[in-house]
């Protein structure tokens, strides 16, 4: 979740509920402070835990990743996400902002994931960084 800004923005813009997972207690404390001043803080939950241990709740149907962690941890997180969909089938979309090529290569090999779209975000920033994009996958069980 980092400082929680994406979660707070999304809950404000879309009226959704958001859960942010952060493992660093200092960054988590900053997210909690941001939540106090956020207009949509009541629809935002921040948890201090390791993402690879997180049990995905049944109501989760969108997951946002911002270049979050190592490929080894990503594998565990994707396993938990797909297991949640096997237990409780539903539409579930995964959004990867600023993904590493290693992430995309791995995600393309996961049988339960289907590539949906790619949003080019290079126009939002100076330069031509090819990682400035959002790649979307759907869990397909």
Where are these regions (language model features)?
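S-adenosyl-L-methionine
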Residues: 29-58
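C-terminal substrate-binding/active-site "lid" region of AdoMet-derived donor-dependent transferases
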Residues: 72-136
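A short SAM/SAH-binding and catalytic strip from SAM-dependent methyltransferases
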Residues: 61-73
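Gly/Ala-rich phosphate-binding loop of Rossmann-like dinucleotide-binding domains
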Residues: 11-12
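Conserved SAM-binding motif I beta-strand of class I
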Residues: 17-22
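Glycine-rich SAM-binding Motif I of class I
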Residues: 4-8
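Short beta-strand-to-coil "C-cap" segments at the C-terminal boundary of structured domains/repeats
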Residues: 137-141
């Amino acid at each position: 979740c980092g400082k929680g800004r994406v979660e707070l923005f999304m809950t404000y813009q879309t009226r959704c509920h958001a859960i942010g997972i952060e493992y660093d207690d200092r960054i988590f404390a900053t997210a909690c402070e941001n939540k106090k001043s956020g207009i949509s803080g009541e629809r935002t939950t921040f948890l201090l835990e390791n993402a690879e241990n997180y049990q995905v709740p049944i109501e989760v149907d969108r997951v946002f990743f911002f270049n979050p962690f190592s490929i080894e941890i990503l594998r565990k997180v994707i396993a938990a996400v797909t297991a949640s969909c096997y237990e409780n089938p539903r539409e579930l979309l995964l959004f990867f902002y600023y993904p590493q090529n290693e992430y995309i290569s791995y995600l393309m090999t996961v049988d339960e994931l289907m590539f949906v779209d790619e949003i080019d975000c290079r126009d939002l920033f100076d330069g031509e960084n090819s990682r400035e994009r959002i790649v979307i996958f759907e869990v397909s069980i």
